[in-house]
């Protein structure tokens, strides 16, 4: 009997030791911190271009990791870009071709695969579609575009309005999750998603005042007349002078506009229902009106300065001077919102450092697409032209990625899901269409053989009136077809014409290049399962939807 009792005692001691061992055992797969801003142009990150703003915290990732100079998107518009990132598929296969079409919720997203593989997952900030992101254990997300001031968040258990500035709040939520909700026995996938610097570019009040006093260098193509391109560039509604709104965008008091009576040029534009509309004071007050009295008092100081300047000087300005005024107003607010993003990225990176998390955490900084900062006289995105087609991409992974390296390889947001899955040693679904960036991250560049990428934009006729188009882009050339109500081709020599000012499609000197690019474009369309039949399918869906609206 004593022997039997002794055996039981030994058994329970062994079990207890095993239990303790299991409790303290850690999963050593890498954590992933995915940081994405909305409409953050690569020109507004100082590691890419330091003429407009200094971004020391975001630059840390370039200094301590890899910077991609030819990163680009598959469809330069918010929700479709995010759907591509989540699914690893082009818009025509994941179904999210534009901001208005529903996302196919049967699609598998990479956070779902991470959760299934034992990762703890969380998402804070702007998703832009749906109110219940799949595959995340914890979330607070903005409804749709969300608001800059005192924003509402949709949560897993309840919705809430949080007082403050959205960029700070998203960071507070992220750091609070790290402090109070992280399971240290599991690796984490954190989706840290900023609203800024999306239109209408409302800065925090102190940044609003600071940046209003700054002046910024103009792009060389600010006064582009689109003379050597087709109809798409000429008909787009993205021009600073003729389409940027006085009240909502430039933040002139509606009362000032009313007092002045007539302000030229009159801003008229097409909305998502194809209706011709004018700017309305509600577009200003829907943002400003969210502020409480003390917040308004801070904003009013700068708002009064803007309106006083506008009222005094606008009537005597010529069109060139008005264009320059609008450019400065645009840059002051856009860059002020980015300054807040950079400050807050620094807060999160510092938290990782201070809590010994940096060493085993892959940190990614990107944007859902690029953005025009006055190039070609434009704001917004959508086109295959470089400023909207290209996007920033910085990745840090200590002991895996050599610090301070630069890659000019053609990579896309299509590749993110497969990259993260491979890094986490999770099986990659066969229907994902990208390629893992792991060879480029780990110095095995010889294993990377992509020479060109495919692009397809759909949201037309709609806001900004950028025509539907698809194309192929290599390091040297860009071939694009605009379709639906036109059938026009454009070809750009990216080395000789980096600003994409001269369409050489009809130039006989480029005949062999043009023919080769046509063949390669068709090859890419077959590879990625796109076709004219799919074009017609989505056009018919668009027409049916608009018919039902009317």
Roles of regions detected by a PLM:
Residues 2, 7, 17-483, 487-489, ...:
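Formylglycine-dependent sulfatase
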């Amino acid at each position: 009997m004593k022997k039997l009792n002794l055996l039981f005692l030994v058994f329970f001691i062994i079990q207890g030791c095993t239990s303790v061992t299991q409790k303290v055992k850690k999963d050593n797969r890498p954590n992933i911190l995915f940081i994405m801003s909305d409409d953050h142009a690569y020109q507004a990150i100082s590691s890419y271009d330091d003429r407009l703003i200094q971004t020391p915290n975001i630059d840390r990732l370039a200094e301590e990791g890899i910077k991609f100079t030819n990163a680009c998107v598959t469809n330069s518009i918010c929700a479709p870009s995010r759907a591509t990132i989540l699914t690893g598929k082009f818009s025509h296969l994941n179904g999210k071709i534009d901001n208005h079409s529903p996302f196919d919720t049967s699609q598998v997203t990479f956070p779902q695969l991470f959760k299934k593989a034992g990762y703890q997952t969380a998402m804070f900030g702007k998703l832009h579609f749906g109110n219940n992101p799949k595959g995340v254990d914890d979330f607070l997300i903005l409804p749709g575009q969300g608001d800059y001031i005192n924003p509402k968040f949709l949560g897993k258990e309840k919705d809430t309005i949080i007082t403050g500035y959205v960029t700070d709040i998203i960071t507070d939520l992220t750091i609070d999750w790290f402090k109070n909700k992280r399971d240290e026995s599991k690796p984490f996938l954190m989706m840290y998603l900023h609203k800024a610097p999306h239109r209408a570019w409302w800065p925090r009040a102190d940044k609003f005042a600071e940046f209003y006093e700054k002046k910024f260098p103009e792009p060389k193509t600010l006064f582009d007349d689109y003379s050597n391109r087709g109809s798409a560039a000429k008909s787009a509604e993205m021009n600073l002078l003729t389409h940027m709104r006085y009240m909502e965008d430039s933040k002139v008091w509606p009362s000032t506009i009313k007092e002045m009576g007539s302000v030229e040029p009159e801003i008229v534009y097409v909305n998502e229902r194809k209706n011709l509309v004018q700017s309305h004071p509600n577009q200003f007050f829907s943002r400003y009106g969210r502020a409480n009295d003390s917040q308004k008092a801070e904003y009013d100081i700068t708002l009064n300065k803007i309106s006083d300047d506008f009222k005094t000087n606008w009537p005597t300005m010529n069109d060139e001077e008005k264009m320059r005024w609008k450019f400065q107003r645009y840059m002051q607010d856009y860059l002020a919102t980015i300054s807040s993003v950079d400050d807050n990225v620094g807060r999160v990176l510092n938290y990782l450092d201070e809590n010994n998390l940096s060493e085993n955490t892959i940190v990614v900084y990107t944007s859902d697409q690029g953005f025009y900062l006055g190039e070609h006289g434009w704001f917004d995105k959508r086109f295959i032209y470089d400023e909207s087609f290209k996007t920033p991409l910085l990745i840090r992974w200590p002991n895996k990625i050599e610090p301070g390296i630069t890659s000019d390889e053609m990579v896309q947001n299509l590749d993110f899901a497969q990259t993260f899955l491979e890094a986490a040693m999770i099986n990659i679904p066969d229907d994902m269409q990208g390629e893992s960036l792991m060879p480029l991250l780990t110095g095995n560049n010889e294993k990377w053989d992509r020479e060109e990428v495919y692009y397809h934009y759909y949201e037309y006729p709609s806001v900004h009136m950028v025509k539907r188009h698809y194309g192929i882009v290599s390091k040297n050339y860009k071939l694009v077809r605009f379709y639906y109500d036109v059938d026009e081709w454009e070809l750009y020599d990216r080395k000789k014409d980096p600003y994409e000012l001269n369409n050489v499609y009809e130039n006989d000197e480029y005949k062999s290049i043009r023919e080769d690019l046509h063949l390669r474009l068709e090859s890419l369309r077959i590879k990625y399962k796109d076709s004219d039949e799919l074009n017609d399918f989505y056009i018919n869906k668009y027409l049916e939807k608009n018919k039902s609206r009317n």
